Amino acid sequence: MHINQLLQHANSDLPLLQANFGLERESLRINKTNHRLAQTPHPTALGSRQFHPYIQTDYSESQMELITPVAHSSKEVLRFLGAITDVAERSIDQNQYLWPLSMPPQITEDEIEIAQLEDDFEFSYRQYLDKKYGKILQSISGIHYNMELGADLMNELFELSGYQSFIDFKNDLYLKVAQNFLNYRWFLTYLYGASPLAEKGFLNEELSQTVRSIRNSHLGYVNTDDIKVPFDSLENYISSIEHYVKSGALSAEKEFYSAVRLRGSKHNRDYLTKGITYLEFRCFDLNPFNNRGITQETIDSVHLFILAMLWLDTPKKLNQALDKAQKLNDKIALSHPLEKLPKENSASLIIEAMEALIKHFKLPSYYDDLLIAIKKQVENPKLTLSGRLFEHIKHASLEHFGQKKGQDYHNYAWQNYYALKGYENMELSTQMLLFDTIQKGIHFEILDENDQFLKLWHNDHIEYVKNGNMTSKDNYVIPLAMANKVVTKKILRENGYPVPAGAEFDNKDEALRYYSQIKNKPIVVKPKTTNFGLGISIFETAASHNDYEKALDIAFIEDYSVLVEEFIPGTEYRFFILDGKCEAVLLRVAANVVGDGHSTVRQLVAQKNRDPLRGREHRSPLEIIDLGDIELLMLQQEGYTLEDILPKGKKVNLRGNSNISTGGDSIDVTETMDPSYKQLAANMATAMGAWVCGVDLIIPDTNLKASKGKPNCTCIELNFNPSMYMHTYCYQGPGQVITGKILAKLFPEISTKI
């Protein structure tokens, strides 16, 4: 069977949409003060360009290149790009932003510094480009769209094709897509062209009118006119480029700047034996109306377009057809943004192919909607990207528009700065670790998003991380021991560390009989194996029998076994221990409200919960304050109800425990805490055998120094998988970076290269 009619003969259940995607986005760093090209080096926060897989520099030191990992869906690739963009925006200097347009602002060659790369070849290659094309032309930016047809899709098409060699089949299939893409590329230039003008001084001769896409015209970043590479066969394609390299017309194979590039091997000739792996489509201008430079709708519309290239037959006289198509593309690129497609266009053929695909393979209605939008743009150029951008041109310039959009997107990156855009549904500690992973250039894969399970790697070194800090560094049994508060107390007591006295109960009746022994004492009632402060009731004065019974009911909901311990007076502090060292100390203030003289307790809680730092399920630095049984019991002990109005300045606690996870406030006291307590907490974690540990100490007076013989404190709990976000993004205080230190411990070879 011929490749040309392959899809037409495929069954409707073919996994047509199965594909792998990758995006590359170029953007210039701009100085906020003068809106000129930033003159600072590539940010040191972004690790080493020797190996960074996600954030590189393109031609110049100020031109960032954001590169997604391979994604198995179009949604995932855009999410990757959004996260990498988020990291880039928050890693550049605070007085900089990323330019949102393909064409640069006003710029001079003196402002452009070639990227200071350690790779001698790459640096020399950029020097060569400077001499041949000039620095200014290199400042044009865009989006590269990479796509590989899915393995199941390729296998089914191969079986249908009748080919004997899978490599030959792949090569012919991808070459056909490349051929048709070049033949119909002008359609994408019409829809997505977004470089309508050049700022003063960019072009040698000013344009007579605003256009659709300078970047996609002969005025953009293209090879010299003498470079003509045929696409009629893979052998001719390879031989032609090799000839130009050998003759010196091209310095390397990668200097061939086609709108589509065959990818998968370092050298083109390897495609004959190893096969083309995927295609790189290089003709997309940045969409300045989106902070990522491209939208989901564009990605999916282009995907449909590429599949249509597989549906359509290739032209019979290919080389002549591609020459004609190139001229048409240049004409459309240099036409006015509000001008309709020229009469010689064959847009109807492309649209019909898309319609046929949707119908034949029964694609979701979403693709019908995409096609409807495309048809509207064909009829009305105002709806195209350049048509929309045309409205923002002022005094033959887009600089003001670019400045505003660029700064808006930079500010957006700093909104909810504790989160990683696109991954907000994951636990905050995991988001923070992912941010640092991307920033430092460590490869990552989310193995299970709901379970917060990550795979991280650099070269051959692989680490698995769960919930932000559960790693292979901790023995399996250690978290189990810390989850069991009885076991924890026994181990600490055996090692000479102070813990509260108390008793354990497996049933409520037995615990109620214990009341006679504690009825006149302050106590704490808590589940045996809970975390995050769940099910804990604290009585700083003696509890009534009724309140004690309520506390037992609350605790038994969380676990089958309950502890009743003595209440230790003093202030509770959380010490974060990593590999035998205290990295942070937090004073946690129990969930509370402060009266204003006219609001009820219920209203005060609602007001405090409106703080943007508060959220749920560990997705925000602070947690929403609930009004459940525990809070109502605490409120009752203080003599108030939810409908009472608190006097101005009156503080009322709603929880006895001070966990941030139950609505508490976080105050960083790392720098002011006496080092003796930090060391004592670290020693406790070491005694437990924990690599990562949260140590909760009650300290009556921090002015007194601590020692093992005279600790002046009591350990009420050790926590496996301690939260990290509360140490970094605090209610008060400077905050301490934790996730970066976790990565440095896991990948010491990375930190030595940064």
Swiss-Prot record:
Binding positions (ATP): 516-574
Residues bound to Mg(2+) 2: E717, N719
Complexes and interactors: Monomer.
Matching Gene3D superfamilies: 3.30.590.20, ATP-grasp fold, B domain
Residues annotated as binding Mg(2+) 1: D696, E717
Keyword Ligase in record: yes
Family: In the N-terminal section; belongs to the glutamate--cysteine ligase type 1 family. Type 2 subfamily.
Residues annotated to bind Mn(2+) 1: D696, E717
Region called Glutamate--cysteine ligase, residue ranges: 1-333
EC number(s) on file: 6.3.2.2, 6.3.2.3
Domain ATP-grasp: 489-752
Cofactor binding note: Binds 2 magnesium or manganese ions per subunit.
Functional description taken from the UniProt entry: Synthesizes glutathione from L-glutamate and L-cysteine via gamma-L-glutamyl-L-cysteine.
Keywords of this entry: ATP-binding, Glutathione biosynthesis, Ligase, Magnesium, Manganese, Metal-binding, Multifunctional enzyme, Nucleotide-binding
Residues reported in the UniProt entry to bind Mn(2+) 2: E717, N719
Keyword Aminoacyl-tRNA synthetase set for record: no
Broad class of enzyme this protein falls into: ligase
Gene: gshAB
Pathway of action: Sulfur metabolism; glutathione biosynthesis; glutathione from L-cysteine and L-glutamate: step 1/2; Sulfur metabolism; glutathione biosynthesis; glutathione from L-cysteine and L-glutamate: step 2/2
Name under which the protein is recorded: Glutathione biosynthesis bifunctional protein GshAB
Pfam name, any one: Glu_cys_ligase
GO MF annotations, alphabetized: ATP binding; glutamate-cysteine ligase activity; glutathione synthase activity; metal ion binding
Cofactor(s) named in the record: Mg(2+); Mn(2+)
